Regions:
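Non-catalytic terminal and connector segments of soluble metabolic enzymes
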Residues: 1-60
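Short, conserved charged micro-motifs
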Residues: 2, 111-118
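Helical scaffold of the NTase/Pol beta-like nucleotidyltransferase catalytic core
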Residues: 41-85
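Catalytic domains that recognize anionic headgroups
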Residues: 68, 87-90, 103, 117-136
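Active-site nucleotide-donor binding segment shared across nucleotidyl transfer reactions
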Residues: 68-113
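Conserved catalytic core of two-metal-ion nucleotidyltransferases
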Residues: 121-160
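Core nucleotide-handling region used for phosphoryl-transfer chemistry
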Residues: 140, 150-181, 185, 195
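Hydrophobic alpha-helical interaction segments
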Residues: 186-201
Length: 201
């Protein structure tokens, strides 16, 4: 406890008045730049206008005022927290034209995802996975699952997150995990394999 207090005291003593603590590692740097500047770390570092001058931020983060599009939403969330689109990733960016379409995600940390996304739970039931996120002025439905909620085996769910791949701006399961998780979903969650899924096996 004394060591933690001394560390905190050092931050306070050497802190900048009216400043903001930025980060302690690359992950936190990515999160802060994405939230505050609305861009990825790579985009920020590629800037040609970084001359050391300081300017005030005058706009609210997107999580406060709403995301411009699903593409915008995922470009920022990709920098902030770990997730995968469980199914139908090729249809995600078409979901904006169909407000009845849920986007199914497995997230590593539900509280972190909610904080960065602005997701609002549809029902107060703690077991309900449905959330709404304001995208381009419309509520888009997301089903948010975690390794701990029993939707998939916890160790398998974590492995799916650990082995995720970036495809067309979205994190998705590896090809092998995509196949088996879809079959598991069809048999364990839906009790039957739909015609759409059957052609994949």
């Amino acid at each position: 406890a004394k060591r933690a207090f001394n560390t905190a005291k050092r931050y306070i003593t050497f802190g900048v008045k009216d400043g903001v603590h930025s980060s302690v590692n690359e992950r936190e740097t990515r999160q802060n730049i994405a939230m505050l500047l609305d861009e990825s770390l790579d985009e920020f570092l590629a800037r040609k206008d970084l001359d050391g001058s300081i300017s005030a931020l005058t706009s609210l983060p997107a999580v406060e005022c709403g995301w411009r599009s699903l593409e915008h939403f995922f470009s920022i969330i990709n920098e902030c927290t770990s997730y995968i689109v469980l199914r139908n990733a090729d249809q995600v960016f078409k979901a904006k034209s169909d407000l009845h379409t849920d986007i199914d995600l497995l997230v590593s940390n539900i509280n972190e995802f909610i904080a960065f996304s602005g997701a609002v739970k549809v029902k107060s039931n703690s077991h309900h996975a449905a959330y709404l996120i304001n995208i381009a002025g419309y509520p888009v439905k997301f089903d948010l699952r975690t390794p701990e909620d029993g939707y998939y085996d916890a160790s398998w769910a974590q492995e799916m997150l650990d082995s995720r791949v970036l495809k067309d701006g979205l994190y998705v399961p590896s090809p092998e995990n995509a196949k088996w998780s879809l079959l598991y979903h069809a048999l364990a969650h839906k009790k039957s394999v739909s015609a759409d899924y059957a052609i994949l096996f």
